[in-house]
């Protein structure tokens, strides 16, 4: 009986308590995505076209205030929605304002550093907090062989191929760049596109956008339990709301 009870509790946590985004479409789910730092996004100028010519490199810094990278996963059935914050990651962006299509962006995320259901993230999303022991249990399943499989694959990577300036501006009115590149997850690499709203000056950069991927594109199924009574949706929303600083001399 204890094992059955434990199984049910785990299902409630991973699929978890409430109706979440059950019945919503991917478009509706995207409207529910959370950007932590909407109010502080501006850093000084309106876009890359205002900068002096020449290549420059910025490094994204997870240690900077309001620099967040996380994954949102919505429930497909009974259960709550999940937020998984990346606590160990790094990335960079290099571009020349006169040759934006030649930009180079890379981001590497440590799977071991993915921390689910942190208090500040659940507060941000307006969801009830999860106990420490329950978070640990969710983290264990997230790293499991049927999910991210940490034992075999310790990083998630994105590397750009090209960039293009969009005719549309982002939600904050800043220039939007569509970054085409390759994403590697669980050892599988797929071509993806990442629309990024970018504010930048000579010393700092802020970028925010959502990369949408699907479990099945990378060879695994969304977490499911009790015959699908508790199940996550196929879509994985990698939310970037990040800050960076220019590399001295570059």
What label would you give each PLM region?
Residues 22-250:
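Low-complexity, acidic/polar, glycine-enriched regions of mature
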Residues 1-9:
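Bacterial N-terminal signal peptides that target proteins for export
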Residues 10-20:
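Bacterial N-terminal signal peptides
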């Amino acid at each position: 009986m204890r094992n059955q009870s434990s199984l049910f509790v785990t299902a409630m946590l991973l699929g978890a308590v409430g109706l979440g985004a059950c019945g919503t479409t991917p478009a509706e789910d995207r409207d529910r995505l959370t950007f932590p730092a909407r109010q502080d996004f501006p850093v000084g100028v309106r876009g890359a076209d205002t900068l002096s010519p020449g290549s420059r490199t910025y490094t994204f810094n997870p240690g900077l205030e309001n620099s967040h990278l996380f994954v949102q996963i919505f429930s497909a059935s009974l259960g709550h929605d999940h937020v998984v914050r990346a606590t160990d990651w790094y990335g960079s962006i290099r571009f020349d304002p006169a040759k934006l299509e030649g930009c180079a962006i890379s981001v590497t995320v440590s799977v071991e550093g993915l921390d689910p259901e942190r208090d500040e993230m659940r507060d941000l999303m307006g969801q009830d907090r999860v106990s420490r022991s329950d978070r640990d249990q969710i983290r264990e399943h997230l790293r499991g062989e049927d999910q991210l499989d940490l034992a075999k694959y310790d990083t998630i990577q994105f590397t750009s191929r090209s960039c293009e300036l969009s005719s549309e501006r982002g939600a904050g009115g800043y220039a939007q760049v569509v970054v085409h590149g390759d994403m590697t997850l669980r050892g599988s690499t797929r071509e993806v596109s990442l629309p990024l709203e970018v504010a930048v000056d000579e010393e700092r950069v802020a970028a925010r956008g959502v990369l949408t991927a699907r479990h099945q594109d990378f060879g695994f199924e969304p977490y499911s339990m009790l015959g699908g009574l508790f199940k996550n949706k196929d879509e994985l929303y990698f939310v970037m709301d990040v800050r960076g600083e220019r590399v001295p001399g570059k």
